[in-house]
A protein has these predicted regions:
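Conserved radical SAM core fold
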Residues: 107-108, 148-150, 179-184, 196-218, ...
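Structural preference for beta-strand elements that scaffold enzyme active sites
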Residues: 138-142, 172-174, 196-198, 241-243, ...
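N-terminal [4Fe-4S]-dependent radical SAM core
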Residues: 3-18, 22, 26-27, 47-87, ...
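Single conserved hydrophobic/aromatic residue that forms the stacking wall/gate
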Residues: 340-349
């Protein structure tokens, strides 16, 4: 027998393998799983074993010699002429010390540093990008940190520099910020250049401040709400497009968070993303633990949202909050139309 392609899968309760030839997932016992792990690695089925699978049409020899992306042949063209977005990490510094931050020291990777980007480096990156996006329909420049607004002067220089060199192409500016450094000058700048803005806010004061604190240990909720009020007063139309990112940790009270975003007049349905603490590489696993209460609250709200989409119940503030959770699915799957064919009972040839 030639080479076969399978993928072994283990869950807390059972063991399986995925068979490419029949596009099937098959449950197996412990002994079979160990043999299949070897098959997965060697791509060869030992003689005289796993006969019941072979008889069922599984573990067939594959005719595939190589798998590649449909755009593989165009990669060079895309990279050299259609580069879509430039992300500048303008600093690795941050004025907050959030417990679940990827750079907090609670993950097995780098922690916050004093590294910052200088303007010469930024110019080289922008020049590199402009040279390789000449055939793109529009440009996109994003600023990332740390906390990017610690380098507000650099960001202003970068925006000015790319605007002078972009030609007649449209450009989108994007930034994710913790919302604590939004002075009047910053607000005026963001509105002027129509930044796509995402602000981190973990719901009500108690839920937010337990994780998102300044270096001194003081919570950041109050100053963020003050800045949001100032931004909304400055330009309400711009503010209506601002997005918010809410991270749920084991210490969060999801019921209070939903209530806060539903009732606080600063927020509209559809502007809040809800995420859980990333458990990958996390040293303190308790931070990412989902409590039973939070699980029940989220599932109930999600079911309400689905029923509202299906027009089985009226929309309420909470179900509107979760409407964004369907957007990823809607972006992936376009509506498909099906044609039903009625075949004759007897086919004459």
């Amino acid at each position: 027998m030639g080479k076969v392609l399978i993928k072994c899968i283990q869950t807390p309760m059972q063991k399986y393998f995925y068979d490419r030839s029949l596009d099937s997932v098959v449950m197996v016992n412990d002994e079979e799983y160990q043999i299949l792990k070897t098959v997965e690695k060697t791509k060869l089925v030992p003689d005289g074993v796993l006969r019941r699978f072979v008889k069922s049409g599984l573990l067939r020899e594959t005719a595939i010699e190589e798998i590649e992306h449909p755009e593989t042949e165009n990669l060079h063209l895309l990279a050299e002429h259609y580069m879509g977005n430039l992300i500048l990490q303008v600093t690795q510094q941050c004025n907050l010390r959030c417990k679940y931050c990827a750079y907090s020291g609670n993950y097995y990777n780098r922690s916050h540093t004093s590294n910052r980007m200088d303007f010469e480096t930024a110019k080289k990156a922008i020049d590199f990008y402009l040279k390789r996006s000449e055939k793109a329909d529009q440009l996109a420049l994003s600023f990332y940190g740390g906390e990017p607004l610690l380098e507000f002067e650099l960001i202003k220089k970068c925006v000015s520099y790319i605007l002078q060199r972009k030609g007649d192409k449209k450009i989108l500016f994007t930034m994710t910020t913790n919302g604590t450094l939004m002075t009047e000058d910053v607000i005026e700048f963001l509105v002027k250049y129509e930044f796509n803005l995402m602000i981190s806010l973990d719901g009500d004061k108690k839920s937010h401040d337990i994780n998102r604190r300044f270096k001194t240990g003081k919570g950041s909720f109050d100053i963020i709400l003050e800045n949001l009020s100032r931004l909304k007063a400055y330009n309400e139309e711009y503010y209506s497009k601002v997005l918010f990112n809410c991270v749920i940790s084991s210490s969060s009270d999801l019921e209070n968070i939903y209530r806060f975003y539903s009732e606080e007049e600063l927020f509209e349905a559809g502007t809040v993303n809800f995420n859980y603490v990333n458990p990958v590489g996390l040293k303190d696993e308790t931070l990412s633990r989902i409590t039973q209460k939070n699980f029940r609250v989220h599932r109930l709200a999600y079911i309400k949202m689905i029923l509202s989409v299906l027009e089985k119940r009226k929309w309420d503030a909470q179900s509107r909050l979760l409407r964004r959770e369907l957007q990823d699915i809607e972006l992936l799957y376009e509506p498909v139309s099906y044609t039903h064919l009625t075949l004759p009972t007897i086919l004459r040839v």
